[in-house]
Amino acid sequence: HCVTRRQRQMCIRDRYHTKMNAMDPMNMEMLLNAVDMAENEEWKGIVIGNDATNFCAGANLGLALFAANLAAWKDLDDFIGLGQDTYQTLKYSEVPIVAASTGLCLGGGAEVLMHCDVVQAHSESYIGLVEVGVGIIPAWGGCKEYLGRIKEFGLVPNGPMGAVMKAFEVIGTAQVAKSAQQARSMGFLGPNDRITMNRDRLLSDAKKTLIELSKEYSPPEPRTYSLPGFSGKAALELAVNDLALSGKVTPHDIVVTNALADILTGGDTDITAVSYTHL
């Protein structure tokens, strides 16, 4: 990592090298340590970025597969739990955090962006929650963040099912934005996120954004979600079953998408407001 002491900024970049900057426990510990240092040593904030071609291609699935092959389920649970704790720490940090994205920002990489206060995105940022494409679901807060963004950004009509159906479609089909501009229209980036056309200026622009953000910063308030519950879950599962009858999805696809439907609708409950921690 590097620091700019004159302006009291911290820039996290390339301390631990993984293939395509995949997220693993060492990277997560680095992020947690950075937030702790920034909060306790009065830094203005943190920029997360790198000089590589890709920001982050997702979680280190090789590590997860290795644990699964050994039936090391506790280690796998710990990996998932560490990710959830890390991303929530980014979201509610006492200092502002800016992500400087470029190239592939997939799965866990997209989740990093959605848990930062502002994204300074290179125009050639490819952003998406692609986990369903490899037979799993987003585990580090991507579902709740994307669901909340769709409604907050006014991308769907009001009502409990509009945002749920949109999130189910985008996440369930592993859609990827082909540019930062498209990512904004899809809800992966918001109206406060910024776009840099020149890759060479990305980190510089991110630092300037951080300085602006630090002047009057307060952490975001936790969201609550009004979800359709059992009836919404049944509707989504029915749609998936129709696809299964026509031979368009595999049996495992049904397992994965039903689990996704359970998360996005709040599970077997009536229409109710639930907290982000519940999701």
What are the language-model segments listed below?
Residues 76-79, 84, 88-223:
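Conserved catalytic cores of soluble enzyme domains
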Residues 228, 232-235, 248:
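Conserved small-residue motifs centered on glycine
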Residues 237-279:
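C-terminal extensions of enzymes
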Residues 13-15, 28-74, 84-100, 122-126:
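A structural preference for short, pocket-lining loop segments at secondary-structure junctions
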